[in-house]
Amino acid sequence: MVKLTEIEIRRVAVIGAGTIGASWAAYFLAHGLDVTVSDPAPDARDKVARHIDGAWPALEKLGLAPEASPDRWRFQADPSAAADGADFCQESAPERYEIKIELLRRLDRALPREVVIASSSSGLLISRLQEHCNYAERLVIGHPFNPPHIVPLVEVVGGFKTAQATIVTAMEFYRAIGKHPRRDAPSGSTTVGWRPLRAWCWQFSAGSDRRRRCRRLPRCRLPP
């Protein structure tokens, strides 16, 4: 369990179980959370199990929560069923608008209004992803760096409809489980981390506040 200011997070739904999603699942397990994983691939369950087993030795070296266990997860092929009972949802489906928009629409209908849905997307516009969600205010980008179970940096980006409370909850949750969340200004933009040279040039020309944030990025081990 992770206790935040306003809520407690016990169960996380990880929707999309490729490299990023499976790595997220391992990381959440290492911090004592119950995890439900969903992915449509026929061999997804076995791949997730192998990924968690492979990641666990490194997570042990980094330090496990007292309640951590590599066995506290279950698999549901249907994303709506996987989301049932979740206190936080981390979506990591393929980077295609048609896939993510439909998936997020389904998750938005399945989850209670107060549950934050964070997308791992790095290159899609958050405001476009929100277009078909009834509760768009609870949708945010929570973009990890690869692999998420090792690299601590997470970029948090809100869309035009994202509520401030959603940003606060996502930032607090990531921080509580050992991540280093960095917030980008709410906009229709994508994340900046994978485009460091272009982003740094722009950030440094935009004023002192952005310069300070930009300097923090390399400290969290930007990948090549």
List where the protein language model places each region.
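NAD(P)+-binding Rossmann beta1-loop-alpha1 motif at the extreme N-terminus of oxidoreductases
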Residues: 1-55, 62
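Amphipathic alpha-helical segments at domain termini/boundaries
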Residues: 12, 26, 30, 69-88, ...
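Internal alpha-helical scaffold of NAD(P)-dependent oxidoreductase catalytic cores
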Residues: 31, 135, 156-187, 193-224
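Conserved beta-strand segments of alpha/beta enzyme cores
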Residues: 34, 72-74, 116, 138, ...
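Hydrophobic/aromatic beta-strand patches that form the interior of the parallel beta-sheet core
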Residues: 36, 90, 140-142, 182
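Rossmann-like NAD(P)-binding element
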Residues: 40-47, 58-116, 124-125
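Rossmann-fold NAD(P)-binding glycine/threonine-rich loop
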Residues: 102-153, 158-171
